[in-house]
Amino acid sequence: MTKAQSIAEIKQLLQAPVTEEQLATFAADSRAGVQKLVVQYHKRAAKLAAQKAAFEERRQTEKALWPDYPLVAGIDEVGRGPLAGPVVTAAVILPHDFDLWQVNDSKQLSFKLKQELYREIMAQAVSVSIGIASPERIDTENIYHATELAMGEAVAGLDKQPDYLLVDAMTVPTDIPQEKLIKGDARSISIASASIVAKVIRDQLMINYDQQYPGYDLANNMGYGTAKHLAGLAELGVTPIHRRSFSPVQNAL
């Protein structure tokens, strides 16, 4: 007689996809612990299926364009709201077979997953380019125009000229046909990829700045006006990476 698998063994097996036959065997197991594991497995499978379906829905934006515009670039920015640091923009052209289903609005992703997806996007993308709006440019041009210019630089820096642009809630100063998508990082895989690239790069910049300018908690707040950041401004004053046109910084001058 074959010895029944332990609940611990079944739990380990159900961490990965199993065959319908295996699942039926576990479902017929009368032990309450096994029944609980089967329910959890079905919930995880349903969640995964929903995430993949949502990715495919976002991918439809690009698929509708590809027959006429084979090279579609998604453009997004990170960092318009902080008191310190640059705005980082990214332009990303994805291959038509891109299927990294976890790619979504970077605000929905954990720090670790963003790092992993960043590496995959950089490896798989047809082309990636970055544009930077420095604090000085932000103060000179205003935040919106500085971001537009940085987006234009990101597009110009692509090593393949895109046929069409999908832009998150802004307009890029270029003659290339484009579409402005509100909440585009949740509607387009190219924009979502650009948001991840821009976010990871900007976060690393702010972590580096935290070493250069300690006392503002920049590695944690990423330049946003948290209580610790404002306390640092009050105690230590303004650094070269602060945006002097932003009122909380002006108050510390």
From Swiss-Prot:
Q: Which CDD domains match?
A: RNase_HII_bacteria_HII_like (cd07182)
Q: Where is the RNase H type-2 domain?
A: 70-253
- InterPro entries associated with the record: RNase_HII, RNase_HII/HIII, RNase_HII/HIII_dom, RNaseH-like_sf, RNaseH_sf
Q: Which GO terms describe its molecular function?
A: manganese ion binding; RNA binding; RNA-DNA hybrid ribonuclease activity
Q: A biological process (GO) annotation for this entry?
A: mismatch repair
Q: Which PROSITE patterns match?
A: RNASE_H_2 (PS51975)
Q: Which cofactor does it need?
A: Mn(2+); Mg(2+)
Protein purpose:
Endonuclease that specifically degrades the RNA of RNA-DNA hybrids.
Q: What name does the UniProt record give this protein?
A: Ribonuclease HII
